[in-house]
């Protein structure tokens, strides 16, 4: 009696890879959507421009997804700046910035920044007043608190994504 061995390993591997790619697109797409919903709570152009830039990519060869935002300010929104930066890693004190009159929506930062100097509150108010007297749209700040739109999305979706993975791969 002879036994015939049929090798279906290629088909099994292809089915697993296809399921993995579909799962990665679904999970990463959910992360982008939830991050954007988290930014809906925030007001102003600063957050609106960031919301329009969240995206994901799936590397089908590595079977991995990357979710991110190419705008530098997305890092500041996530981790905070100045006195409010996560882990105390921000610049201390007050600083002055000037809104860039040449900026257009979606083109990047709408604020001119040249390295800046940290001031006391009173010094920053004086510098701002001088710049405003010169016709510039100057403002002072000591930073912004972290909003954590991405981390909050991850924390909220992690159980759902794990459940989704178990369901998708259980079917195989």
Range-by-range predicted roles:
Residues 1-172:
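Short, Lys/Arg-rich flexible segments
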């Amino acid at each position: 009696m002879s036994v015939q061995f049929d090798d279906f390993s290629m088909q099994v591997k292809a089915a697993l890879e296809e399921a993995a790619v579909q799962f990665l697109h679904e999970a990463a797409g959910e992360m982008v959507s939830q991050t954007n919903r988290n930014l809906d709570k925030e007001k102003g152009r600063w957050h609106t421009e960031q919301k329009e830039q969240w995206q994901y990519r799936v590397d089908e060869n590595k079977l991995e997804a990357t979710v991110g935002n190419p705008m530098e300010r997305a890092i500041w929104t996530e981790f905070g700046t100045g006195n409010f930066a996560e882990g105390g890693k921000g610049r201390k004190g007050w600083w002055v910035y000037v809104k860039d009159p040449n900026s257009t929506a979606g083109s990047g930062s709408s604020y001119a920044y040249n390295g800046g100097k940290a001031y006391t509150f009173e010094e920053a108010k004086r510098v701002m007043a001088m710049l405003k007297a010169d016709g510039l749209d100057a403002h002072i700040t000591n930073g912004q608190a972290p909003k954590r739109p991405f981390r909050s999305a991850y924390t909220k979706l992690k159980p759902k994504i794990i459940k989704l993975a178990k369901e998708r791969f259980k079917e195989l």
